[in-house]
Amino acid sequence: MRISYLFNSSIPSSNPGSIQVANMCAAMSILSHDVNLITPATGLNVPFSKFYGLKNSTKIKKIKIFKRFPLGINYYLFSIASIIYGIFIKTDLFITRNFFTLFLLILIKKKVIIEIHHDLSSEGRVVKLLYKIFDVLNNKNIIKVIAITNGVKKYLIKELKVKQKKIYVLSSVSGLKFTFKNLKKKKNLNVGYFGSLEKSKGSDFIVKLAKFDKKNNYFIFGGNSKEVKKLN
């Protein structure tokens, strides 16, 4: 099967999302799929396999007119350009994280898997309007809706009315290995959460846990002043 992963971010990069996508494409290649990773012409000037330490046959296609992270009008233009290239190479199945790209793919009746990491709060007005008007995520051309956490799954069911049977929870992981030596036992731990304060990311769970667990100290790093006030 020829699979095209349409990815808006930089490759190669140490960005967590880039690491996850690289490993995912490598895994699909090992399963004998013809995998194409379509991205903007951004990222480090290092060979893909060497940077990630992967042995795979993932084909990288960088769309050269997008030399920076696609923002504004380029956000929409990259979606169109990446889909056109995917069609040109006769893709059987598309994979994307991008809500606008997904909308275009189902509009032209292409088979697609959507990988969802967050809610719609960080999306632009166009995307929010499209998902308010149309029942996008229940479209028959979507093979599966991948939610990376149960929190995202609950959001999809409650807020976007996605059918539960269409959603599969598959958490992201990194290929990094850590070895901790000479750890000292402590009566109290300092627990840190780093990342987005979007509810679907699980930050509200950390707050609830901190209220319940009085023994340890909890710290949250991320978000803006508005999100912090809302979290409290």
Provide a role label for each language-model segment.
Residues M1-V21:
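Nucleotide-activated donor-dependent transferases that construct or modify glycoconjugates
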Residues S4, I146, L183-K201, V207-D213, ...:
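Conserved donor-binding/catalytic core segment of Leloir-type glycosyltransferases
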Residues F7-S14, A26-L77, V152, G223-E227:
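N-terminal strand-loop element at the rim of the active site
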Residues S10-S13, K67-P70, T91, L102-F103, ...:
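A short, histidine- and acid-enriched strand-loop-helix "catalytic/donor-clamping" loop
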Residues N23-A26, I83-F88, F103, L107, ...:
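Membrane-proximal helix-turn-helix segments that form the acceptor-binding/catalytic region
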Residues T39, H117, D135-K181:
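Donor nucleotide-sugar binding/catalytic pocket of nucleotide-sugar-dependent glycosyltransferases
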Residues G43, F194, N217-L231:
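Glycosyltransferase donor-sugar binding loop
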Residues N74-F78, K110, H118-N141, K154, ...:
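Nucleotide-sugar donor phosphate/pyrophosphate-binding loop at the beta->alpha transition
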